[in-house]
Amino acid sequence: MISVAVNGYGTIGKRVADAILKQPDMRLVGVAKTSPNYEAFIAHRKGIKIYVPQQSIKKFEESGIPVAGTIEDLVKASDIVVDTTPNGVGAQYKPIYQQFQRNAIFQGGEKAEVADISFSALCNYDEALGKKYIRVVSCNTTALLRTICTINKVTKVEKVRATIVRRAADQKEVKKGPINSLVPDPATVPSHHAKDVNSVIKNLDIVTMAVIAPTTLMHMHFINITLKDKVEKKDVLSVLENTPRIVLISSKYDAEATAELVEVARDLKRERNDIPEVMVFDDSVYVKDNEVMLMYAVHQESIVVPENVDAIRASTRLMSAEDSIRITNESLGILKGYLI
């Protein structure tokens, strides 16, 4: 049983903490929070131990939230830390993890240099075995890598061109925008996603462009893949249908808009309406000779959660990729095939 700390209890952190509680081989030591907001109150209500910076102890206690200790205490009590702090903050905490000789999992908002390896479970789990510091790539990069590494099982992927329509903010991020604009992210090519993919697949020819859209629900990707050999559409659909963490969306559902997919998640009683699987629209899959085009939706709040769980096992050499992915999927109810 591995003891896991989660530093940060926001959009990703609370989902990772809940996922750890569902693993048969992990124990959640507690979570770190810096302010006593509603998320801290909910964590306390769930019985999760809360650790805070030394200077914040009084503020939490005055709010009625008992404190289990400092963030340093949390790190010392754990075998490994999943750092889900805001972009760039994880690198500031790394010296603490090093001080106590603890392994750590970082998120895609950190620079790749913060870790020994960037990670995507379906692509390079074995390369991450025993690595002390692992960086789980961002939500968009996770989706790109899952898709690319899956199609690579049909025949070698030689080139990728992708356009990413990014959500402007998570649903709780009320101070972010835009509200009525499309914003190039950036107006230069490539966007950072290509470099991020290359941090996992070193020599892949990939170019990405991105734009921010006024929505909070999901991202959308439109990708063009050039393969080494000619393929049939049925082979591409088959590998997508039979790969875990990817689901197909059929037009017969009459639910292709991201808002409709969120409603599907509600009706399926998904926790927090999460869909951690890449959602590929099956009618969008186009194949001609060695060229494949497709579009899919990405739920940015949950897609990296199973990757974090697998990264814990890879870092601590708990088990093989196949076993870890299977246990994670089963414990979190993650599907393959068609969503409905």
Curated annotation (Swiss-Prot):
Compartments, record wording: Cytoplasm
Name listed for the protein in its UniProt record: Glyceraldehyde-3-phosphate dehydrogenase
GO molecular function, one term: glyceraldehyde-3-phosphate dehydrogenase (NADP+) (phosphorylating) activity
UniProt binding sites for D-glyceraldehyde 3-phosphate: S138, C139, N140, H193, A194
Keywords: Cytoplasm, Glycolysis, NAD, NADP, Oxidoreductase
InterPro entries reported for this sequence: DapB_N, GlycerAld/Erythrose_P_DH, GlycerAld_3-P_DH_AS, GlycerAld_3-P_DH_cat, GlycerAld_3-P_DH_NAD(P)-bd, Glyceraldehyde-3-P_DH_2_arc, NAD(P)-bd_dom_sf
Biological or metabolic pathway of the protein: Carbohydrate degradation; glycolysis; pyruvate from D-glyceraldehyde 3-phosphate: step 1/5
Binding-site list for NAD(+): T11, I12, G109, R167, Q300
Originating organism: Saccharolobus islandicus (strain M.16.27)
BP GO annotations: glycolytic process; lysine biosynthetic process via diaminopimelate
Pfam family name, one: Gp_dh_C
Record field: transmembrane: none
Major site of localization recorded for this protein: cytoplasm
Record keyword NADP present: yes
Reaction(s) catalysed by this chain's protein: D-glyceraldehyde 3-phosphate + phosphate + NADP(+) = (2R)-3-phospho-glyceroyl phosphate + NADPH + H(+); D-glyceraldehyde 3-phosphate + phosphate + NAD(+) = (2R)-3-phospho-glyceroyl phosphate + NADH + H(+)
EC numbers: 1.2.1.59
One GO CC term on file: cytoplasm
Active-site residues, as the UniProt record annotates them: C139 (nucleophile)
Subunit structure: Homotetramer.
Coiled-coil stretches: none
Similarity comment text for this entry: Belongs to the glyceraldehyde-3-phosphate dehydrogenase family.
